[in-house]
């Protein structure tokens, strides 16, 4: 069974638009927070990955979301994040947002293991995800 993690977020007034509901980009920010919480739970914090492997990180290739119910200030949101398909250079993450057990949003991200590409300005290049990183991401969660 692949790793999963939960992240809890309290919606603040500043997260909302003039209608008093969460402004949609905030959900993508919270997906990013939850993604790195999953990596940290696997013993793979971003700073350590950058130092050890010289990567930029796991930039997004795709991001999508299906919105079910609006969220408002002071809502306590739980994000259940799990690893989806893992390929040679990319991985998929799935985020299920809920409030009091009710589904709010489902989001999906595809990220790529990336290094700087020194042959072009601001360039990135995809590389294979190291086997030890794959092993940590796919290991069963400790009891």
Predicted feature locations:
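Hot-dog-fold acyl-thioester-processing enzymes
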Residues: 1-60, 116-143
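A contiguous binding-surface segment within folded domains or other stable secondary-structure elements
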Residues: 52-75
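HotDog/MaoC-like acyl-thioester-processing domains
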Residues: 7, 67-76, 83-143
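Intrinsic disorder/low-structure terminal segments
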Residues: 23-27, 66, 96
């Amino acid at each position: 069974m692949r790793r999963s993690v939960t992240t809890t977020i309290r919606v603040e007034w500043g997260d909302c638009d003039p209608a008093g509901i969460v402004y949609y980009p905030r959900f993508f920010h919270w997906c990013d927070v939850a993604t790195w919480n999953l990596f940290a739970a696997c013993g793979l914090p971003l700073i350590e990955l950058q130092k050890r492997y010289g990567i930029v990180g796991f930039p997004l290739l795709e991001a999508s979301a299906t919105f079910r119910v609006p969220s408002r200030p002071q809502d306590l949101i739980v994000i259940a994040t799990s690893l989806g398909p893992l390929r040679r250079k990319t991985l998929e993450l799935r985020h299920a947002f809920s409030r009091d057990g009710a589904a709010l949003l489902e989001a999906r991200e595809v990220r790529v293991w990336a290094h700087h590409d020194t042959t072009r300005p601001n360039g990135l290049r995809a590389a294979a995800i190291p086997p030890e990183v794959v092993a940590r991401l796919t290991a069963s969660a400790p009891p």
